[in-house]
Amino acid sequence: MLREIIEGYAPDCEQEVQDRRMMLTYLDLFPGDILTRANEIAHFSASAWVVNPQRDRVLMLYHNIYKSWAWPGGHADGEENLLGVALREVKEETGIERLRPVTEQLYSLEILTVNAHVKRGKYVVPHLHLNLTYLLEADDAQEVHSKPDENSAVRWFGLDEAVKASTEPEMRVVYQKLNDRLECLKGGRA
């Protein structure tokens, strides 16, 4: 299922062409543990670009490890259904109860570098997140709350404001890509 999703995805930029190629290579190299954190080189994760129905606001959280405003998301932890992972992570990390995929198709993909850090008292070596991103929609009137062991705040941002709120230059590029795609979708409303 995962291989088919990645193979079926049509990249529209060089970053995605190369990242897609490498994800497929990693699937071949690590067939047994690419979905789990047991693979300390690279493993799959899922993220969500959560927009309101008007598609002019995006839900972000202040990530405790990265010390930056970021999208919700998390590790596959053995789960091959990464859309399901993205939905679960949004609910867990933001308190949002009602949300839906704008489409079940992959919205973007990217290989993200993760620096060494300490999580729950354990040292985590530098590694790669093979990340699949899904476009989700939620009513921005819903109550949100943080998940203190992972983030310290959750709030809605205007699209441009969300990009600027990130303190990670490499993630600003990703968030801008997602916003640019959203602008293209607004005309055709999925």
Regions picked out by a protein language model, each given a short descriptive name:
Residues 1-10:
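Generic N-terminal amphipathic, Lys/Arg-enriched alpha-helix
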Residues 6, 24, 175-178:
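Generic L/I/V-rich hydrophobic alpha-helical segments across diverse proteins
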Residues 36-71:
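N-terminal strand-loop-strand
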Residues 77-173:
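Unchanged
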Residues 166-190:
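Charged phosphate-binding loop/patch that engages nucleotide di/tri-phosphates or the phosphate backbone
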Residues 10-47:
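Acidic, metal-coordinating catalytic segment for phosphate/diphosphate chemistry
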Residues 59-61, 74, 145-147:
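Short histidine-centered beta-strand/loop micro-motifs
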